[in-house]
């Protein structure tokens, strides 16, 4: 995803980006079948040593210590193009947190959302504790994160997580129409 956003930002012909899932899910989250090793940096094949500051402290802001979901989320946030999330199905864990920095989110009536971290004994990832309250308010963000429950598109719409809900077959046409409206009616330097 990072490479795709880099390419889109570098292409002046790209005026908007639509992110959706393949198949029935938007993104069902991390594969937790490895148990604790799922989040063990030392077990990752792409592991890098954490860089140090001159005073010997770890440079925590560097990509070497940021989790993969955090890097993707930050890249989406930094995108130079408007980003539309077309949430077509299950969006749990990183699947729900990666959509938070998207400029506009629309959902299929079949979409399901879940900030399930508390139920898994892990902390919310990818700056979701920063993005989520800004989108839905502190009370809703706390409820969703503390209960870890799965909720549907109607609740996501009512609480402001998504802009609109569409029948599954109408989701991508709606996302494309929105992208086209942005591209046709906004100067490239204004959005």
Tell where the protein language model's regions lie, with residue ranges.
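Conserved CoA-thioester-binding segment of acyl-CoA-metabolizing enzymes
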Residues: 1-24, 37-38
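Short, contiguous strand/loop micro-motifs
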Residues: 9, 59-60, 139-141
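C-terminal capping/lid region of NAD(P)-dependent oxidoreductase domains
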Residues: 15, 190-191
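Glycine- (often His-adjacent) and acidic-residue-rich active-site loop
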Residues: 21-75, 91, 121
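Crotonase-fold acyl-CoA enzyme core
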Residues: 74-188
